[in-house]
Swiss-Prot record:
One of its GO terms (molecular function) is ubiquitin-protein transferase activity. The lineage of its organism: Eukaryota, Metazoa, Ecdysozoa, Arthropoda, Hexapoda. Expressed in pupal wings, at the boundary between vein and intervein territories. Keywords: Developmental protein, Notch signaling pathway, Repeat, Transferase, Ubl conjugation pathway. It catalyses: S-ubiquitinyl-[E2 ubiquitin-conjugating enzyme]-L-cysteine + [acceptor protein]-L-lysine = [E2 ubiquitin-conjugating enzyme]-L-cysteine + N(6)-ubiquitinyl-[acceptor protein]-L-lysine. Pfam families: C2, HECT, WW. This is E3 ubiquitin-protein ligase Su(dx).
């Protein structure tokens, strides 16, 4: 008959006499104790008892430059104090010191890990208070070789929060109490923020005794160690320092004794046998994947296997009776009831007499298979057909499966149902679990896709590639040739262009339109709508037999602009073009950086000399701009201001290198009179390099060029329409010649032209002997073409060629092939119009909020000022007066996109400051709106320069 501890009456645990405990070294030493057995009186149980506490090691978090000198202080009921020796300069201290203390069943153990210092008070590295009653309840009053892994916490002085600082390993030993005779005081809640513990069934003792780590309550893990006659109780374990995330990172560097390996490995193989020893019943534990089974060998009797065990360790002998499949312990040893395994052990052709006594199996092994036991008593299966071994019992292959061998003789399995292969032998249970997981995964993915997109009425299951039906055809008409409409599993419609093998969300029939065709008015008489192969809409005028992309209906919208400042119809392609260009720039970037030191007074000359003396490829490195006399650090803001100021200088018409297009157009073009400067070609080469650097590094210039100039950069053919933007009078003259019969007018036009540069008349022949050939009605088209080409290039051929050479040295002109002239202007100059609503929507605040009065006054000031002052304010904060093509949401900082920021800094007497590298405005807490306007206006108009804060 067994008592409450699961031991036979009159027998001591592990074959030792009552009153003996095992110390940390594993040797038996007679230690007097009042808890000598389960038969102790109730009064003795309620009195003081001896407990052996071994402080083994700790793993502390690495959070400083200097390593600590840790030691452990143990307090029992806040009275009795014990200390370990200190370990110098270590985050992984090991003490292995044992203390014998007097405790009651309701005692508290307070573990403190402190950092010793000779010059200051010892600092707390972590602490934890443990209520012994919780452990006794969990382990049915037994603390024998009980390893505790305790999470240590430290309290922050700033916010009084507790954070994990490490782990401590301690061993409790030598305590056995009868829980039925104890009076455990109820605990309202665990200290240090731990939740109250719940009563645990005493049957869990067997689980812990098997060596498994068992969570008692939050942050305290416990397990019963197996007894050892040699070696330290920690089993040669080593610890690595805790990472920031905490957690236990333990690994064994020394193999445990044979009897411990037998105990642990038998758990990993899900062996349906219960091993019973003196410390409790061992329950097998399932491992996800066992080790590779040993090669086939002669099975040894179990008595031979356990013959080498030490005398003080009870072997986990196994008896297989002929009448049942359950394993029982040796005579005289009691244990928990053993469940009958689901499948019996099959009888094989083994010569081992122990295996011959096993019961017959309901499902015999397949032909050529054999069951054996290894030296640790673990079952494995031998396949003599393939000369391989397995831990798992072989079962017939599921329907549709086949076993094969590859060229190297390795066995694999073929699933003809799904046309897949696997190295793992399939069974029905594993396939069922996999199919269940697939179904759950598909359901979760479907629910996640439909959560925020559509209503319940629209969430109907649809095939991923469902074809469009007749019901889907609406008033928009059929899709263009080569297009197809499909539907996703979440009912979202997309369109496939089979000609270029692309997909898109937009309907090609309505792409780029502000409203649908249903709401648009009728076309004028003789007009028709058609679509190109790419799905782009155009209009056919049958009256004049012409086509156009512009809607002829009066008041028809030309298409709303997207976030990139281009029509929405082209926004998708422009975004792709821009990403392709940025990819080319990044993939050809060079490491390190180049320094360019300039002064504000001689900005043009300093920049010219430093850029021209460098090889062109060096200009692709990251720029580090330094203004002499200013201590600013260039994280992007200084270089933005350098590009802004230098572009204002080099494109200044006062230098006679460029000129305005006309009186009403302030776009720039090359000045034909630039030859008055003898070094003008070198300057144009420098400007070409500079403009290419702006494109390459993603910076904006102050002002842009004419559209014909951008077309020359893109190597596009110029037309008569391009003259209209730079010389409207000349354009009107050519149009008159084109539309009228010049033979009747007698204009006396010849294929030659004269023009004046700086008072000098220059004669130019449009073609050979052009001054002798008259323009007639028959050859006037040739005349208009030659005249257009001459007007766009007159006097600037060499300058344009040199400019493009300098540009091509830094950025190959082939990289610009993605863009048209308007897109090139957009990425070079940005957007000049400032959208205040977009600005305010993409602004963040620090120590302010959107309702702070200073913030409200700031936006009032922005709205009341004109565009020029807004641009000055933007240039003051960001380094440039232009807005990126994506709006204020794409303002760039030092490490990528960084939004406009307003931060509360300083006193009301201070001027506003800016951090151009981070797009941040330091706005002091002014007391009135007038004061804010005065200080802000003075800052953006009267100040310049950088400094370090």
């Amino acid at each position: 008959m067994a008592d409450g501890n699961g031991l036979p009456a009159g027998a001591a645990s592990g074959g030792m006499e009552a009153g003996q405990t095992v110390n940390g070294a594993g040797s038996a030493s007679p230690t007097p104790t009042s808890s000598s057995g389960a038969g102790a009186s109730g009064s003795a149980n309620q009195g003081y008892h001896q407990l052996s506490v071994t402080i083994e090691e700790a793993s502390l978090r690495n959070n400083g430059f200097l390593k600590p000198n840790p030691y452990v202080e143990l307090l029992i009921d806040s009275k009795s104090k014990r200390k370990t020796d200190l370990v110098k300069n270590s985050y992984l201290p090991k003490w292995n010191e044992e203390f014998t203390v007097l405790i009651t069943p309701n005692s508290t153990l307070h573990f403190k890990v402190l950092d010793h210092s000779s010059f200051r008070k010892d600092a707390m590295l972590g602490e934890r208070i443990i209520n012994l009653a919780h452990i006794l309840q969990h382990y049915n009053g037994r603390c024998e070789f009980l390893e505790l892994t305790i999470d240590l916490f430290v309290t922050s002085k700033s916010d009084n929060r507790q954070t994990k600082s490490g782990e401590l390993v301690a061993i409790l030993n030598g305590l056995k109490l009868d829980m039925s005779k104890l009076q455990i005081q109820p605990v309202a809640g665990q200290q240090n923020g731990n939740p109250p513990v719940q009563a645990v069934n005493p049957s869990v003792v067997s689980d812990a005794a098997a060596g498994r780590s068992c969570m008692i309550y939050g942050g305290v893990r416990a397990r019963m160690r197996l007894r050892s006659s040699s070696g330290n109780s920690n089993g040669g374990e080593t610890r690595s320092p805790l990472p920031n995330g905490g957690g236990d990172h333990r690994r064994s560097t020394q193999a445990p004794p044979v009897w411990e390996q037998q105990q642990q490995q038998s758990q990993n193989q899900q062996q349906p046998l219960r091993m019973v020893n003196g410390s409790g019943a061992a329950v097998p534990q399932t491992a996800p994947y066992p080790q590779q089974p040993p090669a086939p060998a002669l099975a040894r009797p179990l008595t031979q296997v356990y013959g080498a065990l030490p005398e003080n360790t009870q072997p986990a002998a196994v008896y297989l009776p002929a009448g049942g499949g359950a394993a029982v312990g040796p005579p005289g040893v009691a244990g928990p009831p053993i469940e009958q395994p689901g499948v019996g052990l099959p009888v094989s052709q083994s010569t081992d007499p122990q295996l011959q006594t096993q019961p017959a199996d309901d499902e015999p092994l397949p032909a050529g298979w054999e069951i054996r036991l290894d030296q640790y008593g673990r079952r494995y299966y031998v396949d003599h057909n393939t000369r391989s071994t397995y831990w798992e019992k072989p079962t017939p292959l599921p329907p549709g499966w086949e076993i094969r061998k590859d060229g190297r003789g390795r066995v694999y399995y073929v699933d003809h149902n799904t046309r897949k292969t696997t190295w793992q032998r399939p069974n029905s249970e594993r396939l069922m679990h996999f199919q269940h997981w697939q179904g759950q995964r598909a359901h979760v993915v479907s629910q996640g896709n439909q959560r925020y997109l559509y209503s319940q009425q629209q969430q109907q299951p649809t095939a991923v590639t469902a074809q469009v039906t007749q019901d889907d055809e609406d008033a928009l008409g059929p899709l263009p040739d080569g297009w197809e409409k499909k539907i996703q599993s979440d009912n979202r419609v997309y369109f496939v262009n089979h000609k270029n093998r692309t997909t898109q969300w937009e309907d090609p029939r309505t792409q780029g339109q502000e409203v649908s065709l249903i709401n648009e008015g009728p076309l004028p008489p003789g007009w028709e709508i058609r679509y190109t192969a790419a799905g782009e809409r155009f209009f056919v005028d049958h009256n004049t037999r012409r086509t156009t992309f512009e809607d002829p209906r009066p008041g028809a919208p030309k298409g709303a602009k997207g976030v990139y400042g281009v029509p929405r119809a082209y926004e998708r392609s422009f975004r792709w073009k821009l990403s392709q260009f940025r990819y080319l720039c990044q993939s050809n970037a060079l490491p390190s950086h180049i320094k360019i030191t300039v002064t504000r007074q001689t900005l043009f000359e300093d920049s010219y000399h430093q850029i021209m003396r460098l090889p062109a490829y060096e200009l692709r490195r990251r720029l580090y701009i330094i203004f002499r006399g200013e201590e600013g650090l260039d994280y992007g803001g200084v270089s933005r201001e350098w590009f802004f100021l230098l572009s204002h200088e080099v494109l200044n018409p006062m230098y006679c290198l460029f000129e305005y297009a006309n009186k009403n157009n302030y776009s720039l073009q090359i000045n034909p009179a630039s030859y008055v400067n003898p070094d003008h070609l070198q300057y144009f080469k420098f400007i070409g390099r500079f403009i290419a650097m702006a494109l390459y590094h993603g910076r904006f210039i102050y002002s842009g060029f004419t559209m014909p100039f951008y077309k020359r950069m893109l190597n596009k053919k110029l037309t008569i329409k391009d003259i209209e933007t730079i010389d409207p009078e000349f354009y009107n003259s050519l149009i008159w010649v084109k539309d009228n019969n010049i033979d009747e007018c007698g204009l006396e036009l010849w294929f030659s032209v004269d023009f004046e540069v700086l008072g000098q008349i220059i004669h130019h022949e449009l073609k050979e002997n052009g001054e002798k050939e008259r323009v007639t009605e028959e050859n006037k088209e040739e005349y208009i073409t030659l005249m257009t080409e001459w007007r766009m290039t007159r006097g600037i051929e060499q300058q344009t060629k040199t400019f493009l050479e300098g540009f091509n040295e830094v950025v190959p002109l082939e990289w610009l092939k993605y863009f048209d002239e308007r897109e090139l202007e957009l990425i070079l100059c940005g957007m000049q119009d400032v959208d205040v609503e977009d600005w305010q929507r993409n602004t963040i605040y620090r120590h302010y909020n959107r309702n702070s009065k200073q913030v409200v006054w700031f936006w009032q000031f922005v709205r009341e000022t004109d565009n020029e002052k807004r641009a000055r304010l933007l240039q003051f904060v960001t380094g440039t007066c232009r807005v990126p093509v994506g709006g204020f949401a794409e303002l760039m900082g030092s490490n990528g996109p960084q939004r406009f920021c307003i931060e509360k800094v300083g006193k009301e007497t201070w001027l506003p400051r800016s951090h151009t590298c981070f797009n941040r405005l330091d706005l002091p807490p002014y007391k009135s709106y007038d004061q804010l306007v005065e200080k802000l206006t003075f800052a953006i108009e009267e100040t310049e320069g950088f400094c370090q804060e």
